[in-house]
């Protein structure tokens, strides 16, 4: 049963234990009390150890961040992030290479989140097809360069916390 029939992009609703409740909401709709939606993001790293970072469009706050979004109704988190990367960057990901590394629940925001890691060979950034409504530009950045952006207030803070979790995971997993 849908709460709102007017939006094209629907999102599944979950209970506090992350069980689907059989209802959806539209993009931009308020999340009903006692329910949650999924949020996903991915850090893409090349063989030089740099991360593919996007400068968000001005309507999306214009800060640097990684690729993320919301799975549409019926998608798993992994399917959702693969679709987001294709839509925002024009990059086809190999599902078997997409690795989950971190996730949880934020009660105040009513979201569950899943973070993924994807290792690639060097990609020619000019070959990417950016979704201009979401992404102004992309670049490869080192860990030090990401830290500099954070210190200048230019890196999307929510994504920086996820980045720190990734660095911890990479050290443990030796990926």
Residue ranges and their predicted role:
Residues 61-64, 102, 107-115, 120-175:
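Nudix hydrolase/Nudix homology domain
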Residues 1-41, 47:
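Acidic, metal-coordinating catalytic segment for phosphate/diphosphate chemistry
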Residues 39-70:
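A glycine-rich, hydrophobic loop/mini-helix early in the fold
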Residues 27-31, 101-106:
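Short, solvent-exposed loop/turn elements at beta->coil junctions and helix N-caps
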Residues 53, 66-100:
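The catalytic Nudix box helix
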Residues 12-13, 43, 103, 117:
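Residue-level detector of beta-strand face positions
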